[in-house]
A protein has these predicted regions:
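C-terminal catalytic domain of Rieske-type non-heme iron oxygenases
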Residues: 1-189
Length: 189
């Protein structure tokens, strides 16, 4: 993360934007940054992280995509769409949508100690090729099992499986800030 930030700092103001240098740094954010994005939860475990902000909030908007959006929706609606940032939207138990980068991640347990994790990348209808290229780059940099972020997720999943296989406790504690929820009627934040 520091190397990406250092690289960005060396670029002249008028240099071409490098998606790699923009995608990586948010994943080195502090716990406080992640906590500040908030989680909105619904019945049955469905939830989304972020909304007003997320770790993706500072990604630049692809100029071609912005032009297409402005033409289709006008300035006000385009701004509304592009400034609503979620990190993950989870449809419990195993489907995660990353709308900021058009990915769907599916976690499919196939036995007590085996899981298949798939990432599906999508091209938005009418969106420019450059946006799809960025989505695929994100998948390689973040979700791949050889990436900087993917192994952390895979290790967490593996350790959950190990914990579930143990006989020491019936529960695995996976909550934080327990008891600080605010009930808004149709959802918790």
């Amino acid at each position: 993360v520091d190397a990406a930030k250092d690289y960005i700092a060396t670029l002249p103001e008028d240099s071409a934007r490098r998606d790699e240098a923009e995608i990586i740094p948010p994943f080195g954010a502090s716990y406080e940054v992640f906590e500040s994005t908030g989680i909105t939860g619904f019945k049955y475990g469905h939830h989304y992280d972020g909304g007003e902000t997320s770790i993706h909030a500072d990604y630049s908007v692809d100029p071609e995509y912005e032009r297409v959006m402005l033409k289709a929706y006008g300035a006000d609606r385009t701004k509304e769409i592009l400034t609503y940032n979620t990190h993950n939207t989870l449809f419990y138990p195993s489907l995660t949508i990353k709308s900021a980068i058009q990915n769907i991640r599916v976690v499919r347990p196939i036995s007590v100690d085996r899981t298949i994790i798939e990432t599906w990348s999508f091209r938005l209808k009418g969106a420019p090729e450059s946006l799809l290229r960025r989505t695929l780059l994100y998948s390689r940099l973040i979700n791949a099992n050889g990436s900087m972020v993917g192994p952390d997720d895979l290790t967490a999943y593996f350790r959950v499986q190990q914990g579930l296989a143990s006989t020491s406790n019936d529960w695995i504690e996976m909550h934080r800030n327990f008891g600080q929820d605010k009930d808004l009627g149709d959802r918790l934040v």
